[in-house]
Amino acid sequence: MKVGVIGAGNWGKNLVKNFLELGVLSGVADPVEANRQAARDMAPSAEIFSSGRDLIAGDCNAIAIATPVPTHFELVAAGLRAGKDIFVEKPMTLTSGEAEELVNLAETHERILMVGHLLLFQPPIQFIKRFLGEGKLGKLYHLHQERKKLGRARYIENVTWSLGVHDIAVLLYLVGSQPRRVFASGHCGLQEKVEDDVYVHMEFLDGIKAHLHNSWLWPTNRRQLTIIGEKGMLVYDEIAATVTWHRKRINDELESIDEGSEVVFEGSGPPLRIELEHFIDCIKTRKAPISDGRNGLAVVTVLERIMMF
């Protein structure tokens, strides 16, 4: 198997490193000479290109794309038409129309299309997915996701596009469906038309609600997911890497029941390595990735709906 990487900058260099360590890196493309030189130093045996199109025209089986989002559509489409399996970093595209076109293209050419929703591959998130599937919380009521800290502010994309993409992917994955209604409210404090602080509310057909708060203008670093169900509650502290099961509920007589709490999962593996190993496995087995093109389309669709507010 041969995997080429297009984009070897800030994040792309991590893809280069991991594919190299996995023994499948064949080439790297980047328009910036400093990034190309860094790739040469890291992977002397890899072919180095200044153009992603040249890498696509080569003999690699698959391509990983870590370039600015506006370039995703053209590069992914070119790769699929060339018969390559594709891994593309989040968000998949700028619009749901572009994302849907890529999904159809991948299906037409029978290619793997995977989107880099990294948090889905955190071991705690995989544990929570199994935990919910076993029905231990009973009927789900609502989910609360927080991702906020001081910085890193951006000039163009708002905090939801920067930080919230991860959380939207997780919420959709855990609920297992697309929201029927989306509401959002944000505040532009540092600059006009770029929200620093955003609240998102989603309603699903089965009555589940999800609430998301993203901010890069916040005094403390907080990354926490809370899930409320009829039989209890889960809290995932991403910083501490713990999942705590609170056996707390309110019964039919509106009495508060507290049967204690326990840490049911602790620790985390390297999600990027797990994610890329999953991509390689999907190429070999031809199974659909956890974060396939339709998953990427669902996330972009929610992002579009948020931007309407």
Label the model's feature ranges.
Residues 1-43:
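N-terminal Rossmann-like dinucleotide-binding module
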Residues 14, 35, 263-277, 291:
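Active-site loop of classical SDR/Rossmann-like NAD(P)-dependent oxidoreductases
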Residues 34, 46-105:
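Beta-loop-alpha module in the N-terminal Rossmann-like domain of NAD(P)-dependent dehydrogenases
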Residues 54, 62-65, 205, 278-309:
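C-terminal helix-rich "cap/oligomerization" subdomain common to oxidoreductases
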Residues 88, 113-115, 236:
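Hydrophobic residues in well-ordered beta-strands that form the structural core
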Residues 93-151:
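A contiguous active-site-proximal alpha/beta segment in oxidoreductase catalytic domains
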Residues 116-123, 149-181, 295-296:
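Mid-domain beta-loop-alpha active-site segment that forms a flexible
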Residues 165-242, 266, 272-286:
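Contiguous beta-strand/loop segments that form the cofactor/metal-binding neighborhood of enzyme cores
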